[in-house]
Amino acid sequence: MAVYTKIKEDFWSIIQEMQTHIPDFVVDPNKHFLRNRKLNFETMLKMTLLLEGRSINSELDEFFDSNLTMPSASAFCQQRAKLLPDAFKYIFDKFNVQYSHSPTYQGYRLLACDGSECLFFPDKNQAEYHTSCNAYATVNSIHLNALYDLLGRRYIDAVLQPKRNKSENRAFCNMIDRLAVQEEQKVIFIADRGYEGYNQLVHIQKKHMYFLIRVKDHPKNGILTSFCYPAEPEFDSIYPLTLTRSCSIQKEYSSSRIYKRISTAHVYDYMDELDRQDYDLNLRVVRIHIGNGVYESLITNLPSASFPASKLKELYNMRWGIETSFRDLKHTIQLTDFHGKKSEFIQQEIYARLAIYNFCTVIKQAIKIEKETSKYKYEVNFQMLVKTCRRFLKEKRDDEWIRKTLEKYLLPVRPGRRYHRKNVHKGIKSFLYRN
């Protein structure tokens, strides 16, 4: 079977399989999607996956090819209210299982963790989602915590949290624990400041994995305040650390270790307060110069023989891949243009967009690009890739069509390019200003 057609059939086969146990994905299994309607279970899933940034009426007109008997926008909203967000999380997860292969870096799989805000229209009945967009406006927000494969360029897992109840550290721990890896597979988690808690580090170490996390540089408050640093601006040192809850029981302390008491107010999943158990953690702290007199500190448990400071700097720089993926997800996949106000609708669309992002990435990786004489490597323009993949999912097109279409939109990859990060005003695109 043709490669692209097989990827498409694998993607839609998930929905076919879901139809054998529909009650698992609906609000009321005794009532919902029991009758045969135009907007049945399969159609609702497919249409939600293919939503773009237009109005619901325009989306319906596109999906049903301007059929005069197509359902109304009201009917669509009523039907989607019967679906659980878990239905789209299931599609996202199952497609990841189908295409789980990922390139490695020196035999290590690189996973980046980061978070992003998804803004939608305010609702006074959803106080846990309220946040301030600016000094004059209040909006609702869901915090998207994502685990991203930097070399495979796919989202591996996601946790959605209300803005006011968000905990990036707890979400990170959940994604670490849920990660299924093959036997003897080596994984490096790469994260930015905000993920430097001891609890997360121990979760990673318990699974025999590795971490590389940027932390607050001394002398600022942070995880490094317990350590004594060398006088040099750049260094690479190992600090044997013992975590403990105890502050009163007599212990025979070792002068070669640093003892850090974990307050009972802090969550620590692997330490029983009653038994007063300790936990040993060896941290490697590396301080590097990134240019213009600016230094950054990294903590890791990677061996220095295989990963000197220069390698760690290169690895951490690769973390930027998750930042560019958020840009593509929000502005190309159109994650910012939601089609509802209810938090359940927003969660549906977030998981649906993540699934479509991964589908486009798998298609992109299957394309063989050959340039006889070229200074740069080339890749497909992501904006045109998304547009083409959506048409490919909706229409009956063959492999030759998608291959020739995408070959027209190749861009050179120029490594090492840098731009100042711009502060962009965050807002919501009103329903009144959509086509």
Across the structure, where does each feature detected by a protein language model lie?
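Single, function-defining residue in the core of a domain
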Residues: 1-56, 62, 76-83, 107, ...
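Active-site- or DNA-interface-adjacent structural scaffold in DNA-acting proteins
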Residues: 70-129
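An active-site-proximal beta-strand-loop segment
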Residues: 130-137
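The alpha-helix within a helix-turn-helix
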Residues: 61-68
